[in-house]
């Protein structure tokens, strides 16, 4: 099998031939990727058949041969399905490397700030609905139903303590209402120009504000990345509006609605600059290195994916990489980082499900969730709580049942965003900096301090005795 992100074992072609080769070499046990040794159940057969394959194609497809039975009866081989590298190591060595239960302790500051951010976005639904009522606009049943569905999802997420997902659902509802508002009001093209111009000014002002924020911790860096990405997104919507002069005005309303709510979201995320954390060396040099490293990793994945899917289908990944390269050239390394991470995540998501049957996808997701949890837990324990990585992780778990592929994409983003501290060393303490300059170790420095303190104590004792005499 292939080794995918998070140590997940993915399927490969020619498994039957590989088993036969293993038998000729005298092996008695072979490990294969989960879902490649046994055929799907009847339900999955019907689902695949509904996709357009005829019966002869189904029967000829290797993935529907019971390879476990075939290997046992014809090759005297035991075939064992594995999900990840931990299972592989267990079978090879008998050692359970990651047997401990993974528990993430949610950072209390994160919870408080994200809860506040959620309230801002969710209360905005009521605000927009009030605006509609003042204008005498009645929301039609179709839009209202979709808004209430998003609100319902938000309430459920809140009950589970998942404030990021709750905020995301409210954000979607806000766009729906705002778009309906503009469709009913039908503002003129001149009015639209004025709104976009005002939005453009607001974006530049907020961008100037975040450039003054000190970036000292992983939470600072991820907050900067989040706000920067949203502002860049708004800029893209403004550019799109300027290009689409011949399109129906309804398209303009949708673009404006999304851009305004995206900008509001960027403002809300500024709250996270107040969060504490372990200080790291987040200078331009290290940011540039991490940006270019991620671009390289994303390009590698994109080239690999392009071997299996069309150039058109891989276009989105290529566009993200181009965006990262462009940001790198402009010295916007934080924006470069998020775009490269998204490109790599999109490619990894495709590679993770390539050749995976639908009935096995749930197990792939579970394995990926566990891998992400481990990374988040390890970084959190070191005082480097990854606010965006954790947020994506919670959002992915909320999407798992209904939108499994989207959930997988967000898990890939979470994996990358949760381990950013790997690229940034911890900021050196005062003692470490002094020690480097005078060529003594920290232990020697402390020895000097303890020795000096001891000498001071002894001198005090000596003076007291002398006074008594």
Regions found by a protein language model. Give the residues of each.
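Peripheral, non-AAA+ core regions of ATP-driven protein-machinery
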Residues: 1-155, 165-167, 199-232, 302, ...
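Short, charge-rich, low-complexity alpha-helical interaction segments
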Residues: 114-130, 281-300, 355-370
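Long, amphipathic, charge-rich alpha-helical segments that form helical bundles/coiled-coils
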Residues: 148-152, 171-180, 219-243, 317-324, ...
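Charged, amphipathic alpha-helical scaffolding segments
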Residues: 155-183, 242-274, 325-352, 403-423
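Long, low-complexity or tandemly repetitive, helically biased scaffold regions used
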Residues: 182, 190-296, 300-312, 319-322
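Membrane-proximal extracellular "stem/stalk" segments
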Residues: 331-436
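Juxtamembrane/start-of-transmembrane alpha-helix segments at the extracytoplasmic/lumenal side
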Residues: 434-450
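C-terminal membrane-anchoring or membrane-association module
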Residues: 455-469
């Amino acid at each position: 099998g292939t080794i995918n992100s998070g140590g997940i074992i993915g399927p490969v072609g020619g498994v039957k031939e590989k088993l036969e080769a293993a038998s000729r070499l005298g092996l008695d046990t072979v490990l294969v990727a989960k879902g490649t040794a046994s055929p799907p159940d009847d339900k999955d057969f019907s689902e695949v058949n509904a996709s357009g394959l005829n019966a002869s194609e189904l029967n000829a497809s290797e993935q529907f041969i019971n390879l476990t039975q075939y290997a046992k009866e014809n090759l005297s081989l035991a075939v064992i399905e594995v999900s990840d590298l931990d299972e592989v190591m267990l079978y090879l060595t008998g050692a359970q490397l990651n047997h401990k239960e993974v528990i993430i302790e949610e950072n209390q500051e994160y919870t408080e700030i994200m809860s506040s951010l959620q309230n801002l976005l969710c209360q905005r639904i009521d605000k927009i609905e009030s605006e509609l009522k003042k204008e005498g606009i009645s929301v039609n049943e179709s839009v209202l139903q979709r808004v209430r569905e998003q609100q319902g999802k938000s309430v459920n997420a809140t009950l589970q303590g998942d404030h990021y997902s709750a905020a995301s659902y409210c954000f979607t509802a806000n766009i729906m209402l705002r778009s309906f508002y503009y469709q009913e009001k039908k503002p003129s093209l001149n009015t639209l120009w004025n709104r976009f111009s005002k939005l453009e000014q607001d974006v530049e002002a907020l961008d100037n504000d975040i450039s003054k924020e000190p970036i000292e911790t992983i939470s600072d860096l991820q907050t900067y990345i989040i706000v920067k990405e949203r502002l860049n997104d708004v800029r893209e919507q403004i550019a799109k509006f300027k290009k689409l002069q011949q399109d129906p005005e309804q398209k303009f309303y949708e673009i404006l609605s999304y851009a305004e709510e995206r900008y509001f979201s960027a403002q809300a995320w500024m709250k996270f600059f107040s969060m504490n954390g372990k200080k790291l060396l987040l200078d331009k040099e290290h940011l540039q290195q991490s940006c270019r490293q991620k671009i390289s990793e994303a390009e590698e994945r994109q080239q690999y994916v392009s071997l299996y899917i069309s150039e058109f289908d891989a276009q989105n990944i290529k566009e993200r990489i181009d965006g990262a390269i462009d940001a790198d050239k402009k010295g916007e390394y934080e924006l470069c980082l998020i775009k490269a991470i998204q490109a790599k995540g999109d490619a990894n998501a495709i590679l993770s499900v390539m050749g995976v049957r639908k009935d096995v996808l749930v197990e792939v997701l579970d394995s990926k969730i566990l891998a992400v949890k481990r990374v988040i837990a390890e970084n959190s324990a070191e005082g480097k709580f990854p606010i965006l990585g954790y947020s994506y992780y919670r959002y992915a778990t909320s999407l798992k049942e209904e939108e499994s592929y989207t959930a997988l994409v967000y898990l890939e983003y979470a994996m990358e965003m949760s381990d950013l501290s790997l690229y940034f060393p911890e900021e050196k303490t005062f003692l470490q900096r002094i020690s480097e300059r005078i060529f003594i170790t920290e232990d020697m420095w402390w020895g000097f301090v303890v020795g000096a303190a001891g000498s001071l104590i002894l001198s005090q004792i000596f003076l007291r005795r002398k006074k008594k005499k």
